Amino acid sequence: MGNQLDRITHLNYSELPTGDPSGIEKDELRVGVAYFFSDEEEDLDERGQPDKFGVKGPPGCSPCPESPSRHHHHLLHQLVLNETQFSAFRGQECIFSKVTGGPQGADLSVYAVTALPAICEPGDLLELLWLQPATEQPAPAPHWAVYVGGGQVIHLHQGEIRQDSLYQAGAANVGRVVNSWYRYRPLVAELVVQNACGHLGLKSEEICWTNSESFAAWCRFGKREFKAGGEVPAGTQPPQQQYYLKVHLEENKVHTARFHSLEDLIREKRRIDASGRLRVLQELEDFVDDKE
């Protein structure tokens, strides 16, 4: 008969959700589980396939075709910009960081909007930017959106929550994934997409967010602080409940401003962003190999 080798199969595990669907944070010990794979193995990243992992929009949300895989054989142009960097705190707790450097430094690289579907997953937060010559007027504040798959985003635009093609949303020409900038615990991707789809079609008088960033961040984190009027009246919080925005300037200088609500802090941060000009510092070319 001879010896017969058993065929070894590999089981694929979807990512374990670490977010509380209720959006309520609890002070408790969390245990993380990490899986390490050899670089010699072909690791096919399937997280961008919403049907396989149940990331589907509820009724009323247009069906999202399967997102393109992250592994595509084409050239991605990665841009590094000269832009204002921020960090934000509530009391002593860091709640937002758009600062490079350090072990948890933010990646501020941007890509052409045509390249974003290859690096996005449903539920991702996107920041869309406008690059323009220095001779023109300053660009508007960065536009935020929730990626729902198939090159589609849901966003608050011109007083309406709508679903648009990524290439048409705000007519931006570059963008990036900004999931890690806010330090709150995220909801699972399916709930992020449901939050966004569940508000499609709302108009100004029905909307409780004052800008695209607050709406997109609420979809991902479920924090009422992102809503207009979602916190106690100004001036009644103790210092440990107030917000502080740090603007990181050149030569390691930092300007700090205090706010009574997250809504006010975000408004000021976006005002500073809109008043500056984005200038390309460095252009990198990254080849992404097709591993399929």
UniProtKB/Swiss-Prot annotation:
Keywords: Cytoplasm, Phosphoprotein. The modification Phosphoserine is found at S38. GO terms for cellular component: cytoplasm. It comes from the Eukaryota. Pfam families: LRAT (PF04970). It is found in: Cytoplasm. Residues 133-228 form the LRAT domain. May play a role in cell morphology and motility. Belongs to the LRATD family. This is Protein LRATD1.
